Amino acid sequence: MNASRVSSPPRPCFGLTRATGFMTAVVVACLVMAAAPGKARAQEAPPEASEPTSLPPPLQLRPHQQIAPAPAPLLPAPAEATPLASGAKVRTDVLQTINPDTVGTLTVEEGGLGIAMWSGTSRNLVDTLLPRLPVNAASAAMRSLMRRLLLSPAEAPRGESESGGLIALRIELLAAMGDLAGAHQLLTAIPKRDHNERLIRIDADSRFLANDNHRACNLATRQIAERASSYWQKAFIFCQALAGEHQKAALGVSLLREMGAKDEVFFSLVEALALGAAADMESLPDPSPLHLAVARAAKARLPADVVSSNRPGILKTIATSPNASVELRLEAAERAEAMGSLAVDTLRQLYTSASFSDEELANPLSKAEAESGPLSRALLYRTSLVQTVPTAQAEVVARALSLAREGGLYASTVRVFLPLLKRIPPSDELVWFAPEAVRALFISGEHQAARIWFDLLRASSKYDKDAKDALAALLPVAHLAGYKDVDKWTTDRLIGWWRTIKESKEAGKRATLLYSLFDALGEKVPDEAWETLLEGPQRITVAMPHPALWYRLAFAANSSKAPAEREVVASVQPNILVNAEGVDVEAPLAAAQAAPGIGRRRLGETVLLSLLALGESGPGAADPVVLSRVLSSLGTIGMAAEARTLAIEAALAGGL
């Protein structure tokens, strides 16, 4: 990083002259010769408090420990030949090599979008829009849709493009999401992946992020003899340093410098690793996986700006790096968990590892109120663990959720406190806590537990005015979550709901959101309910998607009402139905008929456009007009359940 600086001991001088025009070849030759006596072999000792993130080794390696085989590609083998119906129109074609872009690991039964999900969509549109997928959105529902979109086996969209380019992009996006397991599953399912440098580099980066230096170095050792890119040169130099071959690593660094390579952070860290001296990094605003791996090996303290990165995979690695301060690890961990790349148990462990003074532990609620931040949330979590009285537990959870809602971390904080929340017994003394508990359990999908608290609130509402008002405010959210039988509530009662909440803070904004969500899910909102909102401002400023994306989403959703086109051809095995790539599609398509939405035209396109319309801010920050278009589009393609999940996220993030 040109803008980054590292203070380290003076570099050893090797007295090299300026490189000539063939210096690149010299560098590679020197590195290959240096590798001859022995390949990089060091494996860093496991960190003291690191999340277990080991990945299965590449198939070509032979580690001592046996591991379970990677999932096979979902490209079904042809079944026994069966006669076609008399008169059936088929086209004879030669069975072609399988296109790697069609490979996937998620079956329809597991949530895959089906082999025809790109039917009707051009390759140019996919190549243009898929790289813009909002991989760092803090929405569990969006992340689930992205994962299904990227892991589903499907016929590649039609158009001219390099074979293998789409599968590589899908794996890159999974890795960018921090879903290293999903990326590895897809990698191992690709035939002849060893010939694709782009895929091998993704594999190496994933292993550096997972602190799996041993296998990353195996990849680098094999690649350095064939490829001269600076990435593999630097990776191999790091591996030499890990193996204790510091003179060879220093020679490689000097040669790269002679060539004019610019990466002083990397060079200084490698030199510090060789000299066994601590490196003091002043700045590293956009770290690469290799930077983090070298810094960890060199025990270099990560600078404060390292969390400027907004990449889930990078944040996850920072959160589990022992060479980062507690404050940095907590901030990175909260953001990584919210983006779905870090297990919630790891965040809980980091919360419990934070240290606090006796004064802070004695007054946790006031401390958290005064200084909202990662350490304050850690303090509240620590406090909740030592409380044994249900009322005290409820007070801590309620305060934590209230502060998290203000800070945009509501869903993540609910996941952290969920085990404790489920242990708090509903009682008459805790009626005040029931609305908060119900909302938190709704967004967690814990509907049975939510129902117990809801029934407590409903029973209390018969004699307690506060409980009655709380119930009235909660009923629309309960209906939105799927509780259709609750007090026979319908949208006709929205006018009464408005009277209950209209004096509260941002009532008009919340009503607009709620009405839009119901309308998008196909539940009629009375005209009179909308009319009451006309008393507010007549103009508002909102962030809207580009008009072209807005139009295309409506077009794709409406086009999905027609069944997907399928071309039936006969291969050289004349009685097997295959597509143009020679893949048996009848079995997957037959199974897909039972899944809602599967087999529709532009299914994948509609999902992709919906995710782009919501953007990185997710449903919690989307304007009601945008939400309405996205949810109705998903409903049109048969994804009503997914639309409702997004609606719940939006409603609770919006204060409903």
What would you call each of these model-derived segments?
Residues G111-T121, V135, L150-G159, Q185-H195, ...:
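Solenoid-like repeat scaffolds
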Residues L173, I202-R207, C239-Q240, A440, ...:
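Residue-level signature for tetratricopeptide repeat
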Residues A298, L302-K509:
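Extended alpha-helical solenoid scaffold regions that build the rod-like backbones
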Residues E160-I167, K192-I202, E226-A235, K262-S268, ...:
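Generic helix N-cap/helix-start motif at coil->alpha-helix transitions
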Residues R215-S309, L475-I495:
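Extended amphipathic alpha-helical segments with heptad-repeat/coiled-coil character used for oligomerization
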Residues M177, A210-N211, A243, S444, ...:
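Structural motif corresponding to the intra-repeat A-B loop/turn of tetratricopeptide repeats
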Residues L180-A183, N213-C217, H246-G252, A449-W453, ...:
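Solenoid-repeat scaffolds in large eukaryotic assemblies
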Residues G38, P47-S161, G165-A168, L330-T352, ...:
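Long, acidic/serine-threonine-rich intrinsically disordered regions with weak helical/coil propensity
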